[in-house]
């Protein structure tokens, strides 16, 4: 029997779904949403809060503040409520109503940024500017800064990657979505040091500038960035797959038709992994990807036909009723080999 006294103490680490019957390729999906925060962001949130407490930055009366499109905000709302801190989440209109209501139910203040002062930095830049202004005006406010916080990727170095390795000692390729790149860099660094034969494939969404692509409008929160992630070190990554948001929606519905309701970020990584495996896979390949969240918070967007039609058009809406397998082929992009940083001595295999 498991007994806990605080909600962040529980997290299911070792549940995997065999997706071969769904996508027709060998792929195991690591489910990260089985905790009270509902997403993989619980790990980073717990790690960053614990570090801030050890450093004396968080103390009684502190107010945690963070820029988040949703999942990290929920995780921090839960932890702040449990530990007695205030919490301010700074988000933008892509954060869906259900997520905002969930944060508020946990006692958080939610501020939605709608105006962009610098088009080059977009809504994310506007969110961070607002965070800085609030912190400058009130010393109680403590910005954890998930975009630069080393405890973000270290949480996945300590937990996510070893959990995958324990279950798949013969792993060939790992697909990881790229947002702040905390999950990506934590897993990539761990496998580089301990299992360098594992191929690391990053999955990002078209419109994200993380890997140097042009910025464009993105409607699904989670993966992708409007500025280059400070945590990103491309030398740990072997390939990149870019996924259209329409294919994210198709992948989500494809999974839902088999009874698995996952969030938009999961649809993106499954779509990217499916296209890569269709081009490069073998029946004896061992491949794993990570499902960052579940689908309940996307019922009024990704799973809502009117929303899909308004955003992506009639063709995409009609494609959701077709037989599984209509994911378009996202192109794998080889990553350039660049020198490793001084803290790493071995080479990427």
Language-model-derived ranges and their functions:
Residues 1-349:
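PLP-dependent amino-acid enzyme catalytic core
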């Amino acid at each position: 029997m498991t007994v806990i006294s605080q909600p962040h103490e529980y997290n299911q680490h070792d549940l995997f779904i065999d997706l071969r019957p769904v996508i027709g390729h060998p792929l195991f999906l690591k489910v990260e949403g089985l905790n009270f925060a509902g997403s993989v962001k619980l790990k980073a949130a717990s790690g960053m809060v614990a570090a801030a407490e050890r450093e004396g930055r968080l103390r009684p009366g502190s107010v945690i503040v963070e820029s988040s499109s949703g999942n990290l905000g929920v995780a921090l709302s839960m932890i702040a409520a449990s530990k007695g801190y205030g919490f301010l989440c700074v988000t933008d209109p892509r954060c869906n109503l259900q997520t905002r209501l969930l944060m508020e139910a946990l006692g958080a203040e939610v501020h939605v940024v709608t105006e962009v002062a610098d088009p080059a930095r977009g809504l994310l830049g506007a969110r961070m500017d607002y965070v800085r202004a609030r912190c400058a005006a009130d010393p109680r406010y403590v910005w954890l800064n998930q975009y630069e916080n080393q405890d973000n990727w270290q949480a996945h170095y300590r937990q996510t990657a070893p959990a995958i390795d324990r279950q798949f000692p013969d792993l060939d390729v790992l697909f990881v979505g790229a947002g702040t790149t905390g999950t990506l860099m934590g897993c990539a660094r761990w496998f580089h040091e301990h299992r360098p034969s594992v191929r690391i494939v990053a999955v990002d969404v078209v419109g994200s500038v993380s890997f140097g692509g042009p910025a464009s409008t993105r409607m699904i929160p989670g993966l992708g960035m409007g500025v280059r992630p400070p945590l990103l070190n491309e030398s740990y990554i072997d390939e990149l797959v870019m996924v259209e948001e329409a294919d994210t929606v198709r992948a989500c519905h494809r999974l839902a038709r088999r009874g698995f309701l996952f969030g938009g970020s999961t649809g993106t990584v499954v779509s990217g992994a499916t296209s890569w495996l269709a081009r490069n896979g073998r029946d004896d390949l061992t491949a794993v990807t990570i499902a960052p969240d579940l689908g309940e918070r996307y019922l009024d967007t990704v799973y809502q036909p009117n929303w899909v039609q308004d955003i992506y058009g009639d063709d995409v809406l009609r494609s959701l009723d077709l037989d599984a397998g209509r994911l378009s082929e996202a192109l794998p992009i080889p990553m350039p080999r660049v020198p490793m940083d001084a803290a790493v001595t071995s080479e990427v295999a």
